[in-house]
C-alpha cells in the first residue's frame, strides 16, 4: 500500500488519493491479494479493503496492561485538578471535545459540535461547514444502517428533523436561497458517493452503533472530556482490545481528524479500561481512508497533548 499519511509508523495503513478519471483501475494492496476487479473492469469498492484491514489479525488481538487506563486517568486527574484550582471551585463544569486540542477551532478537522461544544456563533449560528458536516454524518449513519441513500439532501434533512438538537438546523437549510440549497445538495452527492464506496457493510454480529457518545468526568465532574464516535463495531471484552472505531472527516485537515480519533480512543480506554483494537478514518470529500492499530504510545501521546492544553486554560474559559 502507498503511504500518504504525514509519516509512516508501525501499524498504520493509508490509502493513496483516489485516481483521477481515466487513470485506469486502482487496486489497493496491503499485504494480501486485493479484491478482484468486477466483471465490468472496475475496481472493487474500497469498503471491501477497509473491512479486510479491520478484520486482519483479529484472532490475535492484543492484551493491554490492566493498569494502563488507571495510569492515564491519574495523569489527567492531576492536570484537571490544577485547572479547577485556577478557575475556582465555583466555576461551572468545563466540557471539552476534540476541538480543544488545537488553538484554531475554525480550522478544526471537522466542525461536529454538540450542545455543550457548539460551533456556531451569535453572528453566524449555522456555519456552512458545520451544516454540511452534520448532514453528511446523518447520511453516514443511514449508509451503515441501510446501505443506501435515495435522496442525499432530503434523507439528511429528515434525520435532522427528528433530532431535537438539530431540528433548528433543518429549518435553516429549508430556508436557504435556492442557489445555496442546490450547491449544498450537489456537495452532498459527492460526499455520499465516496461514503458508499468507503463504508463497509457490517453484518449484525459486528454490533455496529453510530453516534456513540462518551463522557469522562475528571476532578469530580468539574472537567468533562467528551466526544462522539461516528461508528463503533465489536463487543467489549475485559482486558482485550476488541472494538474497532471508524471516524469520518468531511474535508478538514487529515492530521487533525486523526488526532481527534486518537482522542476518542483515549476516552474509550478510560470508559471501558481497554483501548480499541483498530481505527479507520474515512475522508468523504477526497475518497481516502486510513486504518491503523491503536498502540500504547498513541494513548500516551494524546494524554500528553490533553495535559498541555489543559494547562493553557484558566479564568478566561470559565
Where are these regions (language model features)?
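A non-catalytic, helix-rich entry segment at domain boundaries
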Residues: 127, 131-212
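Metal-dependent nuclease catalytic regions and adjoining charged, substrate-binding loops involved
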Residues: 5, 11, 268-318
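An acidic intrinsically disordered interaction segment
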Residues: 80-100, 219-236, 295, 310
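Non-catalytic protein-protein interaction segments used by genome-maintenance enzymes to assemble
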Residues: 210-262
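Generic solvent-exposed, charged/amphipathic alpha-helical segments
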Residues: 189, 193, 261-265, 307
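Short amphipathic alpha-helical face segments that pack within enzyme cores
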Residues: 134-135, 259-267
Amino acid at each position: 500500500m502507498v503511504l500518504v499519511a504525514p509519516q509512516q509508523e508501525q501499524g498504520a495503513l493509508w490509502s493513496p488519493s483516489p485516481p483521477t478519471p481515466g487513470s485506469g483501475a486502482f487496486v489497493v494492496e496491503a499485504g494480501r491479494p486485493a479484491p478482484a476487479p468486477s466483471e465490468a473492469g472496475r475496481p472493487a469498492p474500497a469498503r471491501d479493503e477497509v473491512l479486510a484491514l479491520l478484520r486482519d489479525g483479529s484472532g490475535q488481538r492484543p492484551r493491554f496492561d490492566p493498569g494502563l487506563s488507571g495510569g492515564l486517568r491519574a495523569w489527567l486527574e492531576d492536570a484537571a485538578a490544577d485547572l479547577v484550582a485556577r478557575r475556582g471551585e465555583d466555576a461551572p463544569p468545563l466540557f471539552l471535545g476534540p476541538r480543544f486540542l488545537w488553538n484554531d477551532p475554525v480550522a478544526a478537522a471537522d466542525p461536529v459540535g454538540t450542545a455543550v461544544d457548539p460551533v456556531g456563533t451569535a453572528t453566524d449560528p449555522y456555519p456552512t461547514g458545520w451544516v454540511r458536516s452534520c448532514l453528511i454524518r446523518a447520511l453516514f449513519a443511514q449508509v451503515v444502517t441501510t446501505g443506501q441513500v435515495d435522496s442525499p439532501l432530503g434523507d439528511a434533512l429528515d434525520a435532522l428533523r427528528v433530532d431535537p438538537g438539530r431540528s433548528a438546523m433543518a429549518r435553516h437549510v429549508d430556508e436557504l436561497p435556492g442557489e445555496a440549497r442546490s450547491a449544498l445538495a450537489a456537495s452532498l452527492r459527492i460526499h455520499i458517493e465516496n461514503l458508499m464506496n468507503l463504508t463497509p457493510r457490517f453484518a449484525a454480529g459486528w454490533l455496529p452503533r453510530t453516534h456513540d457518545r462518551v463522557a469522562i468526568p475528571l476532578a469530580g465532574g468539574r472537567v468533562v472530556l467528551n466526544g462522539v464516535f461516528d461508528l463503533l463495531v465489536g463487543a467489549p471484552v475485559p482486558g482485550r482490545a476488541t472494538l474497532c472505531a471508524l471516524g469520518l472527516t468531511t474535508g478538514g485537515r487529515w492530521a487533525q481528524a486523526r488526532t481527534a480519533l486518537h482522542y476518542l480512543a483515549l476516552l474509550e480506554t478510560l470508559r471501558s479500561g481497554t483501548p480499541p483494537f483498530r481505527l479507520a478514518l474515512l475522508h468523504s470529500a477526497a475518497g481516502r481512508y486510513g486504518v491503523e492499530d491503536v498502540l500504547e504510545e498513541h494513548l500516551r501521546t494524546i494524554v500528553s497533548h490533553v495535559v498541555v492544553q489543559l494547562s493553557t486554560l484558566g479564568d478566561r474559559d470559565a
